Amino acid sequence: MNSPNIHKHILSIIGLWRFICQIFRKLDGLAEEIQRSQPPVELWRKFIYCTSLTGSVIGSVDHMQSQDFDQIVSPVSVAHFSQYKLNALLIKHLEAIGFTIRNEGLNHRHLAEREILMGHTCTSVEPTDNFINVTTSSVTEGNHIENQIPCRFLVGADGAGSTVRNLVGIELRGEKDIQKLVSVHFLSRELGRYLMYEKPGMLFFIFNPGAIGVLVAHDLKQGEFILQMPFYPPQQMFEDFTSETCKKLIFKLVGHELADINVVDIKPWVMHAEVAEKYLACDNRIILAGDAAHRFPPAGGFGMNTGIQDAHNLAWKLAAVIKGIAPMSILPTYEMERRPIALFNTDLSIQNFQAAMAVPAALGLDPATANSVHQVINNTVGSILPSTVQKTLLDGIFSLGRAQLSDFVLNENNPLGSSRLAKVRRIFEEGKSLQLQFPAEDLGFRYREGALVPEIDSEGAPIKPEPPMGRRREYIPSADPGSRLPHMNVRVLSEVKKEVIISTLDLISRDKVEFLLIIAPIDSSYRLAHVVLKVANEHNILVKVCVMWPNGLVNEDARTKTSLAPWENYVDVVEVRQPSNSSSWWDICKMTHRGAILVRPDDHIAWRVKSAVVGDVTVEMKKVFSAILGLL
């Protein structure tokens, strides 16, 4: 695992989607701790476009809507939480459940159970017939130490520059080198206080004749910021961005000097939009996840959120193989399911990045033009003129372009400025600027093939996903195979606690490879449940049955005990309908109560029947589990 001294700003996450917060609800209160620790939503719900942080506002976009705060489609809402803070919380929770975090080397011993090594870098991988021998390097007290770690599986979740990916020769496909940027991590409580009371927001797009940049407000209360600025090598070099130079640029963007500014770190980085050509190598024993498998523009928080989705999909499949529940053939379904999502999110993040460029383009600063000018200089005079002259030429052209942002031009009394400001307003009104939330892609993404029984259309073809829109679409709950199980509050029918209300998502085990069968309390569904439990038991598969009682019609005495005997792994629940949504569970799922839903350990629907199983139920369920787990 990489060093705990994680660079805090390069590609730091600024938004945790609801799907991710739902996952974290199962990790011993992690979601609740994030909700408590994040800044108040009023401090981060807006993106602000301005001429300087203390100057005039060109416009702002509020990215939170009323439905983002209710619990109709999700038991939790989105969160604003930096990646390095999340890493610290994850380590804290791992230690709380018995894991040991170590920074020193192994000293020729084996890696112990529940032991995590920090500060170790993978330097080589050597597959053998039985294991993968991984060589790691670390530095302890100034000494360079190598360790040999044999492992059955190696998951390369080692970032965008993945060593594991490079060692096994997996190529990335997509759009490379979209933009080169400098990221400046700095602190200023003075600026934080001002923005907190005068212009609270998450992102600030700043355009003025002196400088252009995007400021990420990670924590206004603490005064922690990340400034992102494009740069154009070789005329502009990273070495030019010294601490003093960055301070001067920050002051131009703020509108005045800051007395307490502290530049913590300055890093260059390159924006890409790429997905690995494959996710598995070496007989499916080396697996890529997270940024190692895909690199997105940092527009919309797709990188970290997609990476956590990868881990959530992979974890139960690896556990199923290790526990002997499923054969190795289930592992390719990880790539079958996750890679199409990464490709979709790549397209969506590119569209969102292009939307981010719409405002500067409307103001007369089309980034495509800047890139073209830079390319012309490189391809024509680059080999003739001295580097200092090239730099002066490029800086002069860019300064001339930024002059269009002067108060003389950019005002309502200037016909050109008025026209440009009107274009910007239309962009905001039509929702065509950079978006923060994508509810349909957050909760509504669906696996089309893999560890599931897919549904086909009336012509016998698999149902295809809608193309990315680049704009906010609302999430519509679905019980289609491959979809995430819809959320609904339910009351657990228990003789001990009669008022325990949970989400349907809480019915799935958080620490076992266990499937969930949801049925209504009717005879045909009980018979189906008997068969499912019997077939699962024959294959060492855990299944819990959830009997969904309709709201207001539950017979408290007519429990499932006698109907499912001798099986005991079941739970009776009753719908808890919201005042703003009176739909029944089966209405939400667009099914009749005679249907049934089989849910995987990662909360995704593996199989469903809309009304009743036709034919031999035992044969059908054997086919279902074979399709899901790859059983022979």
Model-derived regions, located:
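C-terminal helical "tail/cap" subdomain of flavin- and related membrane-associated enzymes
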Residues: 319-476, 509-514, 530-538, 630
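Thiol-/selenol-based redox modules, centered on thioredoxin-like
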Residues: 610-632
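FAD-binding beta-loop-beta segment adjacent to the flavin cofactor pocket
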Residues: 270-294, 480-512, 564-589
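A conserved short coil-to-beta-strand element within the FAD-binding core of flavoproteins
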Residues: 103-132
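Structural motif
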Residues: 518-524, 549-550, 610
